[in-house]
């Protein structure tokens, strides 16, 4: 993790329209397309907050107010070892770490380009270089599955 919080950055060409990409960012089924060892997901508040569970834990993705049509900004809160029922309050209280994901979307040809940036990995409110390394390793394996799943669902 760099001094400014940057963890990883990936550019992904997609065969779907930008508005579809923005929709998929806050759709549990599309996040599960690439989520590590996915199990299930759900919606807390349509268009604002979702959750996804995998073998390692459960994550809540919340669309932040700083989002624009060009860039959806998500706060990701991950809790390891949390048991159902999953609620925003329970996930926040049991948070192992949080991070920000920037999902920048631009039209290109008959599709779009998604530029995803992972940043600001925090544990207990403090920067966590070891967790940032784990996030980077996981992020480096997501792009292919995301592109395949989202293009198929597009």
What are these regions (language model features)?
Residues 1-45:
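Hydrophobic ligand-binding cavity/cleft-lining segments
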Residues 8, 46-48, 60-61, 101:
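Residue-level marker for the onset of beta-strands and adjacent loop->beta junctions
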Residues 32-33, 40-41, 58-113, 119-121, ...:
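Hydrophobic-ligand binding "helix-grip"
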Residues 38-40, 49, 82, 153:
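Residue-level signal for alpha-helical context at structural boundaries
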Residues 110-154:
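A generic hydrophobic-segment detector
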């Amino acid at each position: 993790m760099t001094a400014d919080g940057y963890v990883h950055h990936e550019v992904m060409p997609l065969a779907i329209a930008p508005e579809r990409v923005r929709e998929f960012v806050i759709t549990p089924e599309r996040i599960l397309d690439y989520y590590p060892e996915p199990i299930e997901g759900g919606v807390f508040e349509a268009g604002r907050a979702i959750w996804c569970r995998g073998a390692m834990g459960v994550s809540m993705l919340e669309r932040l107010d700083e989002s624009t049509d060009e860039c959806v900004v998500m706060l990701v809160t991950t809790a390891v070892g949390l048991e159902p029922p999953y609620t925003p309050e329970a996930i926040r209280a049991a948070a192992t770490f949080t991070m920000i994901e920037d999902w920048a979307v631009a039209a290109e040809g008959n599709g779009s380009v998604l530029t995803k940036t992972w940043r600001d990995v925090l544990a207990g409110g403090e920067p966590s270089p070891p967790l940032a390394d784990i996030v980077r390793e996981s992020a480096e394996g997501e792009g292919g599955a995301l592109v395949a799943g989202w293009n198929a669902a597009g």
